[in-house]
Each structure stands twice: as C-alpha cells, then as structure tokens.
C-alpha cells in the first residue's frame, strides 16, 4: 500500500494502546496488557511485536513508517526525549533512551510527550474542543493527569 504511516502509543498503567495512523486517521489498532511494575524495558519487546504485527496486517513494511509517538504517564522532557519522573509505573523508564530504541529498531524519529498533554491536544485539534482557545482536561485512569490549552497554545 505504501504511504506515510505513524505509530501512536498510549502507555497506560494497565493497558498499552497502539495505533497505526495514516493521514490523521487510525487505520489499525491493538492493545496489549501492561505489566508496568516490571518496567518499561520488559514491555518494549512486546510493543515491538505489536507494532510489527500492525504493519504486517496493513500490508506495509517499516520503510512506510515515518514516526513513532509515545504518550507517557509521567514527567517527560520532550526535547531530550527522556522520561524525567515516573509514578510507581515503569520505574526504569528514566534510564531508557527511547529515541535510540525507535531509531535502531525502525529508523524513524520518535516523539515523547506526557499522556495528559497529548490527550488535551488531541481533543483540541480533532475532538470536542476543536476550535476553542482555552481547554483544561483531567485524565483519570491508573493515575491522574492534567493538560491545558491556553490562548490556543499547549501549556508546557
């Protein structure tokens, strides 16, 4: 099929959601159980397998993949592509170079951001908050997070 596909990963405390995206649309989707107390390094091979399966199901190869984004449930430094702090989930994440992981495995750029911030950006760009300049979102799952859009800009 070919194209400019991206992978979106929502790293939850109990479930990891992985979507294959083309032109801002989810074309394939899967979930895997998270064993977050064992750490992120324990989950990376399972995430790799899930991503490769999505590519295979879509009939494309990794050369059609242009980026991977990961929503992390904790404090991150997106510029340095590093997890800064975790909340008793994925405790080893601060020691993992996720940009290197994505580059060495698929040869694509990797974007890391806080999960609540990405959730509010998604609603602001595509969902219920589309067209508004100020949005506050609280995410409640295994943990609690907040994301804010202020004067049409994500608050960081």
Identify the residue ranges that each predicted region occupies.
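Glycine-rich phosphate-binding loop and adjoining helix at the ATP-binding site
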Residues: 37-45, 64-68, 74-134
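Short glycine-rich, Thr/Ser-proximal phosphate-binding strand/loop in the N-terminal lobe
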Residues: 2-49, 83-85, 154
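Short glycine-rich anion-binding loops that position phosphate/pyrophosphate groups of nucleotides
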Residues: 14, 73-76, 141-143
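Conserved active-site "lid/cap" helical segment
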Residues: 43-62
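A cytosolic small-molecule/anion-sensing beta-strand core signal
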Residues: 22, 66, 72, 150-151
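Short glycine-aspartate micro-motif
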Residues: 6-10, 65-69, 135-139, 145
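Glycine-rich phosphate-binding loop of actin/hexokinase-like ATP-binding domains
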Residues: 130-156
């Amino acid at each position: 099929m070919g194209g400019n596909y991206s992978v979106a990963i929502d790293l939850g405390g109990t479930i990891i959601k992985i979507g294959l995206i083309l032109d801002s649309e989810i074309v394939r989707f899967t979930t895997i159980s998270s064993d977050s107390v064992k750490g992120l390094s324990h989950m990376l091979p399972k995430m790799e397998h899930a991503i490769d399966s999505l590519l295979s199901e879509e009939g494309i190869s990794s050369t059609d993949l242009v980026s991977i984004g990961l929503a992390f449930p904790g404090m991150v430094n997106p510029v340095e592509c590093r997890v800064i702090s975790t909340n008793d989930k994925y405790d080893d994440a601060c020691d993992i170079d996720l940009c290197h992981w994505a580059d060495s495995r698929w040869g694509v750029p990797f974007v890391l951001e806080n999960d609540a911030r990405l959730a509010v950006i998604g609603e602001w760009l595509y969902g219920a908050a589309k067209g508004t300049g100020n949005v506050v979102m609280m995410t409640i799952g295994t943990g609690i997070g907040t994301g804010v859009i202020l004067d049409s800009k994500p608050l960081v």
